[in-house]
A protein has these predicted regions:
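Nucleotide 5′-phosphate-binding alpha/beta core
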Residues: 1-106, 112-126, 132-137, 141, ...
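Active-site glycine/GP-rich loop and adjacent strand/helix microenvironment
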Residues: 1-30, 34-35, 166-423
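Short loop/helix-cap segments at secondary-structure boundaries that form the rim of catalytic
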Residues: 48-52, 158-160, 210, 232-233
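A broadly conserved amphipathic alpha-helix scaffold signal in soluble, globular proteins
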Residues: 105, 109, 129-136, 147, ...
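Acidic/polar active-site rim loop that often engages polyanionic ligands
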Residues: 108-111, 162-164
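Short, acidic Gly/Pro/Ser/Thr-rich loop/turn segments
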Residues: 114, 154-156, 287-290
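Glycine-rich, histidine-containing beta strand-loop boundary motifs that form or position
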Residues: 119-120, 150, 195, 243
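Conserved AMP-binding loop of ANL adenylate-forming enzymes
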Residues: 132-170
Length: 423
């Protein structure tokens, strides 16, 4: 398997490089045509749409995928058998079991429903080779030691173990302090973890409770917000980001720190919310066992206005704002409601709070509860700044009730972090 991984590593690093947008789009359409002919014809579900153009295929989401999984996949796999395998692995914390040759994992269920993802040995090699090509700063043969702080392991991660690079899985369901001690003993060169875990690790280093050499850290599984990035940059040598979901390896940061969509193996249709924000509709033409075709994500992406100096023609993303259900919906002065994006709220709060303070803003009907590990007077300053912003957006702020609560915001390492929540 190592030779296949090396091939896909070379392909991602050297072969699938494009000088301009036109070359990239020509490559996408060639790969999509091959994907439709070689893969979708093997799926009972997708083969029924064979005469349609791609944009005429029905949209997918997690609920549709799970409901039609047995007909969608190309290997005759059964959803319930896969779910049983994945659940057993999560309960036992042993992620070696497979269903035949296929690795199985489960999503975290942030959107309310857990999904499953399946990978063949070939797909594991593609994933591993591509990830290594994009995220290793010194290349494959530099002897990197990579620490993976994840909620669940998977055979995907074991597929890249070799004499040139070592990976170690750190279980987020285990005692965090013990895991940090094991991390110090491992002395990694790269740490991959959710943003809240990297934040907790940075605070431990700042407080003298842990000692690590200068390392590159890569945020995964959660939105890396500006205040967290700023904190991490004060502690670690380099801060990168991977945007990955059950649906695929969607984006990663380049050498200039810009998040680029992985359009070399994804076709992305933007569903525009306004002139700069969109929900991505993705088709992954490298996924053969579990086809991902016109899958609509609830994540809100903001396009970077200026082109990135790295020269990558793939779409550059300014930031990931979170999910549609992270928006606040507040009463409007003119009647009805006003949708307030989470990102401006996060920035207003972050600009007021101390760098090491965390917070949570929760909406329940017209009640906004702001919790933070700082004095209540600072939270009240945040309330005032948010109210001013809401008023400029046409919100009837007199109808909003506030609660400011000074308390520690403990990291919930078992679940994806959401700082702004609408119930």
């Amino acid at each position: 398997m190592i030779f296949k991984t090396l091939w896909y590593y070379w392909r991602a690093r050297k072969r699938w490089k494009f000088a301009n947008r036109q070359q990239l789009e020509q490559h996408q359409w060639r790969e999509l045509a091959r994907f439709r002919h070689r893969v979708l014809t093997k799926s009972p579900y997708f083969s029924s749409f064979g005469d349609l153009s791609l944009v005429e295929y029905p949209l997918m989401n997690k609920a549709i995928m799970m409901e039609n999984f047995d007909q969608m996949n190309t290997a005759g796999l059964k959803r319930d058998e896969l779910l049983a395998c994945a659940r057993l692995s999560e309960q036992s914390r042993d992620f070696k079991p497979t269903v035949g040759k296929f690795s199985v994992g489960m999503s975290s269920g942030t959107s309310g429903q857990r999904g499953i993802f399946v990978a063949s040995p070939k797909e594991r090699s593609i994933w591993a080779g591509t990830l290594l090509a994009k995220m290793l700063p010194n290349g494959l043969f530099h002897g990197e030691r990579v620490a993976l702080f994840l909620r669940a392991g998977n055979n995907l991660y074991d597929s890249v173990q070799n004499r040139w690079i070592s990976f170690r899985f750190f279980d987020l369901f285990a005692d965090f302090n013990q895991q940090v001690q094991a991390l110090v003993e491992y002395q990694p060169t790269i740490v991959v973890a959710p943003a809240q875990v990297l934040r907790a690790l940075a605070l431990k280093i700042q407080q003298g409770e842990a000692s690590l050499p200068p390392v590159k850290v890569i945020s995964v599984a959660e939105v890396l917000e500006p205040q967290d990035r700023q904190l991490l940059k004060t502690v670690f040598r380099e801060v990168g980001e991977i945007y990955q979901a059950t649906e695929g390896f969607l984006a990663c940061t380049c050498s200039h720190g810009t998040l680029h969509l992985n359009e070399e193996f994804l076709h992305i249709e933007p569903k525009w919310i306004d002139e700069s924000r969109f929900n991505p509709i993705i088709t992954d033409f490298t996924r053969e066992t579990q086809p991902i075709v016109r899958y609509k994500l609830d994540d809100i992406l903001v396009v970077k206005k200026a082109p990135c100096d790295c020269g990558n023609p793939a779409l550059a993303i300014e930031r990931i704002e979170g999910r549609n259900d992270d928006q606040l919906i507040l009463p409007a002065l003119a009647g009805g409601t006003v949708n307030i994006f989470a990102d401006p709220c996060s920035r207003i709060i972050a600009n007021t709070l101390p760098l090491t303070s965390d917070y949570r803003l929760t909406q329940t009907e017209w009640l906004l509860k702001l919790e933070g590990d700082c004095v209540v007077e600072v939270l009240q300053q945040c309330q005032s700044a948010l109210s001013d912003y809401f008023a400029k957006q046409g919100v009837d702020i007199d109808k909003i009730e506030w609660q400011c609560v000074s308390q520690a915001i403990l990291p919930d390492l078992f679940n994806k972090r959401r700082r702004i929540i609408r119930k």
